[in-house]
């Protein structure tokens, strides 16, 4: 997919997400709808899309769209735990080359994980996790736009989202 088309799709997605979260307070409903909207926007790129949130010093599974997922991930383990531990977005072109990758699905070939940071402190509240069945699916444009989405979600569901 070319960058111009990808950017346009993300811009439309971001506007849809803003509309979905406006005046809503049901955290589970918001996140379920956002994950579905994300997957529908990129049906050929996103095999699995969902959220993990920091609770009891581990990442715990939140709403998602896709196959059965790992329920808990330790800090520093796999792509999600590493993104949380390092408080940075990770783009993994080939998950089999990522040391310590947790294979929740054998179909996953590439992955991007984006921290959802508390507004102000920057503390990681959770992560957006997206997997693809193709190698090298994600790039810096995905990272940039998904970080915008993470910011919207942090402002919308706030710190209390740890208590889904």
Named regions from a protein language model:
Residues 2, 18, 132-164:
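Juxtadomain coupling helices with adjacent low-complexity linkers
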Residues 86, 120-121:
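Residue-level recognition of short loop/turn positions
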Residues 124-127:
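Short glycine-/small-residue motifs
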Residues 54-106:
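Regulatory sensory and allosteric helical modules in signal-transduction proteins
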Residues 110-119:
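A short, aliphatic-rich beta-strand micro-motif
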Residues 1-63, 68, 156-164:
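Intrinsically disordered, low-complexity terminal regulatory regions
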């Amino acid at each position: 997919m070319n960058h111009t088309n990808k950017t346009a799709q993300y811009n439309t997605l971001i506007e849809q997400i803003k509309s979905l979260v406006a005046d809503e307070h049901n955290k589970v409903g918001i996140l379920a709808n956002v994950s579905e909207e994300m997957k529908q926007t990129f049906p050929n790129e996103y095999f699995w899309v969902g959220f993990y949130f920091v609770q009891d010093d581990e990442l715990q599974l939140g709403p998602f769209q896709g196959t059965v997922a790992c329920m808990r991930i330790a800090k520093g383990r796999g792509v999600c735990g590493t993104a949380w531990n390092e408080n940075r977005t990770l783009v993994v072109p080939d998950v089999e080359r990522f040391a310590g990758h947790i294979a929740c699905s054998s179909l996953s070939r590439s992955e991007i994980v984006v921290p959802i940071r508390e507004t102000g402190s920057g503390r990681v509240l959770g992560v957006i996790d997206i997997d693809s069945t193709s190698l090298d699916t994600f790039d810096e444009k995905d990272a940039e736009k998904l970080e915008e989405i993470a910011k919207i979600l942090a402002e919308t569901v706030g710190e209390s989202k740890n208590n889904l």
